[in-house]
Amino acid sequence: MAPSSKRKAINDDFITTISDNEADEFVEEEEVIQEEAPPKKKSKTIPKKKQKRSSKKASNDDDAEDEEDGHIEGVWGQNDDDDGAMDSDFEFVTGAGVEDLDDNPEFEGWGFDGAKKAMGQGNGVDLDEIIRRRREKKEGGTKGAAEPEAKAEEEGEALGLDDDDDEVLARDAFGMGAGSDDEDSAEASEGQDGSEASEGEEGDSDDESVASPVPHPDDDQESESEQDEDEEEAAKMKEFFAADEPKSDTNKGNASFQSMSLSRPILRGLTSVGFAKPTPIQSKTIPIALMGKDVVGGAVTGSGKTAAFVVPILERLLYRPKKVPTSRVVILAPTRELAIQCHAVATKLASHTDIKFCLAVGGLSLKVQESELRLRPDVIIATPGRFIDHMRNSASFAVDTVEILVLDEADRMLEDGFADELNEILTTLPKSRQTMLFSATMTSSVDNLIRVGLNKPVRLMVDSQKKTVVTLTQEFVRLRPGREEKRMGYLVYLCKNLYTERVIIFFRQKKIAHHARIIFGLLGLSCAELHGSMSQIQRIQSVEAFRDGKVSFLLATDLASRGLDIKGVDTVINYEAPQSLEIYVHRVGRTARAGRSGTAITLAAEPDRKVVKAAVKAGKAQGAKISSRIIDAADADSWQAKIDELEDEVEAVMREEKEEKVLAQADMEMRKGENMIRYEDDIKARPKRTWFETEKDKKAAREAGRAALNGVREALKKKHGGKNLSNKDKKKLDAMAEAKEARVWKKGAAERAGKGAVLNFKKDKSSKKGPVVGGRVAKKGAPRGKPRRR
């Protein structure tokens, strides 16, 4: 070969001496070695005869040959034997090696590399390009109209209503009445004194209005379910869950991963991602999961729940039989982004092992996933729908060998929207499996957990349910009645003046999120959107753009509220309060993760009172930082006026976007028709893909999930043609819900003590008969005769 011939020309033809030009010759030899290094595999296979001949040479000749080959094999060299001595350069690592995740220069957050190889090439409509063209066109046509616009803005500010009283009244904290009974009674007494002192005076000052807050009637009501503990449910839980093990010093000793007897490849993987010490949920879960027990785990957001179930899975898979490749683990997640992130976490933790992973989520190439599943990877991370698709339609893919099932964000997976898909998966997987469930708002309802097929699970609740982290500051901006329509003005004011970097804004609806995306673009705010109407490529691009700092705002629906771990998120803004406290906990959990600090702001109007009250009450119980932020009404009105002026531009952008989507759809249909003609025989030869539900059943499941999330309001809104409900309709619905809850009978204190049930029954019978007159029960209708005189 060429390198060897060059070496012969240097070493054999001419032997240099000290007096010769040694520098030039040495440089030439280095250049030869750097040009083409010999492969390592060649130096490993050395014939025995050659070894015997080489043993007769001097040791300095052996060293020279090793240097010529370009490397030294092993600790003791290529041809040396292991004499049992320890390498002098070896160092013991007693700690994890990395004190903090931020101090590790190699780790830059979880990426989407596992999904990119199965992604297509289409990018969809470039909304930024459309907005850029519209802005350039507008700026070019309105150069001479600067002065009239300035005058119009001054007139608009002069005509604006001064709502300072409303904003000062925000100090009553809109939901702060959710404290203890003593605080409520004290506030009520103060309110009565203030009202008596100011009776007959219409023009109270701002200070007086702050000093005498009037609590809302709904804030004083406490449901009977919160006051009385349901012992029947407690008995069910005691029978269903495994008995609590006595606390020992072993858990206290788990101050490091080394004390858990984990293998060295796993410890190296933990060090590479910056995990120095196990979190409480990890220190509790890993030893129990290694025993093969079922686990129901819950902890606050950002506490490392993914690593809590991935680490014991990897440790167990290190000792698997390796002769026949077998899929042994299935991890299910409710959203594609969460599954992709879980795949990234597991891949990095297993970077020093031979464990194989497969990502099977919707929106990515089926063929790529089928080819990976054909190799039978050890761990399959998937969403329920795509997993069922492969389970029914992919050849050479079987789930008979699955030994471990993990449900990430299990409370969401147990809701009505996933009920049918989850039942299909659970009935197909083997019964003798280990099952682990994790969530920040983990349910304790035994009736829901029974469906999963758990076998005496161990309940590991590190934190109380529906709890936020201590480092999170929660702020609420109250929108007084009549100002809900100016919500977008408040949002733009916050993003322009207060929170300008690394902000996630949550919306309830995809339509509003997309509308806000266009407004932000026209106002010059760099942003990206994330919701279900986008293609998977666009969704990944949006998350990566926000993660890399290319955009400052991520406008998302609740698609991004669960599990998404983006490094450095400083602020979360709720455009409106979510439907429940559980969703609120997951939303605000996108910031203040892994011990960092963060801020969550909620724009709350009157319909959001119920959720805000629950959030404030939960925050007060744990001592969280809760405050009310006051925004000047004039500032919000000025931004809302600018937004109203952009309505024509917004409609024009949406119209142009729709036209480009139609053109892209037509182009795709044309290519599809060409492929149908060109590959007709191959397409017809493919087996038809099947599903376990009909279209009618799928639609019913979607409606059930939507109804469980939004309640009766969604159905009533459809009845009114999709229009927003009036306050009157909303009050009717709330009254119906309260009446429905009141009809549900629960045991009281007397019934649990064995008393009161018969008495209550007698009272009900006597009340039905009528009032008692003269010691007798009067019958219904007109009384017969006069009562007896005494």
Swiss-Prot record:
Q: Which residues form the Helicase ATP-binding domain?
A: 286-460
Q: Where is the composition biased (Acidic residues)?
A: 21-34, 61-70, 79-90, 154-167, 196-209, 219-233
> Where does the source fall among the domains of life?
Eukaryota
Q: Which residues bind ATP?
A: 299-306
Q: What is its main location?
A: nucleus
**MF annotations from Gene Ontology:** ATP binding; ATP hydrolysis activity; RNA binding; RNA helicase activity
Q: What biological process terms from GO does the record include?
A: gene expression; ribosome biogenesis
Report the residue ranges that make up the Helicase C-terminal domain in this protein: 490-634
Composition bias type Basic and acidic residues, residue spans? 137-153
Record keywords: Hydrolase included?
A: yes
Write the record's keywords in alphabetical order, separated by commas.
Answer: ATP-binding, Coiled coil, Helicase, Hydrolase, Nucleotide-binding, Nucleus, Ribosome biogenesis, RNA-binding
Its EC number is 3.6.4.13
Q: Where in the cell is it found?
A: Nucleus, Nucleolus
Q: Which SUPFAM superfamilies match?
A: P-loop containing nucleoside triphosphate hydrolases
> Could you tell me which residues belong to the region Disordered?
19-234, 748-790
**Coiled coil located at which positions?**
631-677
Cross-referenced SMART domains: DEXDc, HELICc
Any notes on this protein's domains?
The Q motif is unique to and characteristic of the DEAD box family of RNA helicases and controls ATP binding and hydrolysis.
Query: What does this protein do, in the record's words?
Result: ATP-binding RNA helicase involved in ribosome assembly.
The protein depicted here goes by the name ATP-dependent RNA helicase DRS1
What organism is this sequence from? Pyricularia oryzae (strain 70-15 / ATCC MYA-4617 / FGSC 8958) (Rice blast fungus)
What is the gene called?
Answer: DRS1
